[in-house]
Each structure stands twice: as structure tokens, then as C-alpha cells.
């Protein structure tokens, strides 16, 4: 994954001080920044030139205090590297020598009104999201009791119908049918493709607009994915988990998500079962396990009998 300096500047509402002058401007491929204070001091043995270069008050003060001939020499060497872009923080003016070298080498220069540390934190967050690994999954993603639940299963098993019932109960739709998933750190986030956002397909009814029918409170743009619930048609003879002590997982983008398999039979209230599954998962996450509690009670009971 990569992002162009122009897209980063647009996303962060940066001022353009100097445009890129190269036909093939280097793209940003790392969710990190470089503050080139050591390079302005003449140290280039270790230089993360491939990152966006952020110049703050300290770097600018040091550069201004250098003798003119030394400053020109350091900047010339600095711009000999394939730098993607330079961002000057704190509303500071761009030194003429730096601007001249940037234009000469075709490196875009942008300006930010924010303090350097605050800007850096926001930029790294934006870069992490922009450069996050992505994957598309078939399913329905909802926010149920504050937990991100992705319902999967083969076509016709009742994913959308179950999701619709959950929305009627006050839960929120994130995406139906197609879920765009991105990984930020060790967390997975899902959202709907913009073209089909807020829409749901119901067999026999067609396409419905969830926001128009249930209101703005029935949808949410993005949600963390905490749990996967897989719906499958009931298979006679298959050993389904009746105690909840068989922990299964599903791997997406290198992250293991807890997985619950729910068999579908006519007349079963799936929405209610999904709600209970969400509540039970939250209890487990907070340290309470119903199976362990039952086991403890049984052991206590038989110990007293002895």
C-alpha cells in the first residue's frame, strides 16, 4: 500500500508552499515521519529519507543559525536523497535556500498551522489508516451492544434477514453483503463501500435504504470487528457446540477473531441468539465464563457430598 504526498496533504488540509516538480514523485509507503535535525547537523549515515520530512521549531532554529555556506551545503546534500515531501509545522516560513532546493529537485513542500508534536501524531494516525492492509469479505457487519459483529455464511442462509431484525431491535448497520476490512495495528475495522453504503438487499423485496427507513441512528460508518458469527444450514448428525467450551477462530489479515458457528433451522430466532452471543462474548472478554462458573459449582457440589 502507498499514498501520494498530494493525497496526504489534501487529507490533512495542508497548505501547498511548493508543488512537486517530478513526473514520478516518490509515494509514501511507511506510516512514520522523519524530523531531519541530525541531517541538518551533517549526519547522513542513518537517514529515513523515504518518510515524510517534518520540520519543526528546533530544526528550523538550527538551520537558521548555520553559516550560509554550511547551510547551502547541508541542504544540497539533504535534497540529493529521494524525499517524498517536506512539511513545515507551526505556520513557520520556508527558508529561501530550502525552497530553492525543493523546487530544483521537484520535492513538494507543505505547511501546517499545528504544533509539531500534535501534527506528527495526527499524521501518523492518518498514515496508519491509509497504508493499512485491506481485504474484502462477504457478510454483514453490525454494531451490537457496542461490539462489532460480522455475520457470515453462504448465500440464502439469512444473513440480511437476521441483520434487519437486529436493526429493528435498535442495533446499527455498518455494511451489508460487502465488508471492506482494514487492519490498524492488531485491530480490524470494517466499513461499507461508498457505492452501496446504507443499502441492504432482501430477497423478495429488493434493495432497501436502511437510513431512510429507520433513521440516521440505525447506521454507523465504521466499526471495529470483535466477533464473527457464521450462519450455516442445520446439518443432521453434525456435532454442534452445546457448552460453549470449544473456542474457534477465524483469521483475517493475520488477526485471529473469535468465531461462533450458529446452525439455522426454521422458526429459530436468530437475532435473539446473536444478541445473547454478543453479550456472552463481552462477559468473557471481561473475565466471566459461564462454562467455568458451572464447572466450579459442580465441583463444589460434589466436594460437599463427599
PLM region spans:
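Glycine-rich phosphate-binding P-loop
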Residues: 145-174
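Structural motif
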Residues: 51-54, 84-87, 107-110, 148-150, ...
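P-loop NTPase nucleotide-binding/switch module
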Residues: 126-146
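Flexible, charged surface loops at secondary-structure boundaries
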Residues: 45-49, 78-83, 143-144, 222-223
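Gly/Thr-rich phosphate-binding loop signature of adenosyl cofactor/nucleotide-binding cores
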Residues: 1-78
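Conserved NTP phosphate-binding and transfer environment spanning the P-loop NTPase/kinase superfamily
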Residues: 226-306
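Conserved nucleotide-sensing/catalytic segment adjacent to the nucleotide-binding pocket
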Residues: 175-233
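Charged, amphipathic alpha-helical linker segments immediately N-terminal to NTP-binding catalytic cores
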Residues: 82-85, 91-126
Amino acid at each position: 500500500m502507498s499514498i501520494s504526498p498530494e493525497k496526504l496533504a489534501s487529507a490533512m488540509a495542508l497548505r501547498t508552499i511548493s508543488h512537486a516538480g517530478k513526473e514520478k514523485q516518490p509515494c509514501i509507503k511507511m506510516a512514520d515521519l522523519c524530523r531531519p535535525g541530525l541531517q541538518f547537523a551533517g549526519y547522513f549515515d542513518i537517514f529515513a529519507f523515504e518518510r515524510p520530512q517534518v520540520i519543526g521549531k528546533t530544526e528550523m532554529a538550527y538551520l537558521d543559525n548555520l553559516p550560509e555556506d554550511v547551510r547551502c551545503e547541508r541542504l544540497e546534500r539533504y535534497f540529493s536523497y529521494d524525499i517524498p515531501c517536506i512539511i513545515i509545522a507551526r505556520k513557520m516560513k520556508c527558508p529561501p535556500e530550502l525552497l530553492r532546493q525543493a523546487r530544483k529537485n521537484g520535492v513538494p513542500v507543505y505547511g501546517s498551522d499545528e504544533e509539531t508534536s500534535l501534527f506528527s501524531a495526527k499524521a501518523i494516525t492518518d498514515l496508519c489508516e491509509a497504508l493499512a492492509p485491506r481485504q474484502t469479505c462477504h457478510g454483514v457487519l453490525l454494531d451490537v451492544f457496542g461490539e462489532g459483529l460480522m455475520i457470515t455464511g453462504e448465500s440464502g442462509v439469512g444473513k440480511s434477514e437476521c441483520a434487519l431484525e437486529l436493526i429493528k431491535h435498535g442495533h446499527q448497520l455498518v455494511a451489508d453483503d460487502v465488508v471492506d476490512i482494514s487492519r490498524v495495528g492488531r485491530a480490524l475495522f470494517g466499513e461499507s463501500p461508498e457505492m452501496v453504503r446504507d443499502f441492504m438487499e432482501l430477497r423478495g423485496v429488493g434493495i432497501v435504504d436502511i437510513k431512510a427507513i429507520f433513521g440516521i441512528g440505525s447506521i454507523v460508518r465504521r466499526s471495529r470487528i470483535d466477533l464473527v458469527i457464521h450462519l450455516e444450514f442445520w446439518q443432521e448428525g453434525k456435532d454442534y457446540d452445546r457448552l460453549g467450551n470449544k473456542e474457534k477462530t477465524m483469521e483475517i489479515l493475520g488477526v485471529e477473531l473469535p468465531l461462533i458457528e450458529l446452525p439455522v433451522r426454521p422458526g429459530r430466532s436468530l437475532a435473539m441468539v446473536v444478541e445473547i452471543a454478543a453479550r456472552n462474548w463481552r462477559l468473557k472478554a471481561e473475565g466471566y465464563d459461564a462454562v467455568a462458573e458451572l464447572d466450579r459449582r459442580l465441583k463444589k457440589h460434589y466436594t460437599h457430598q463427599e
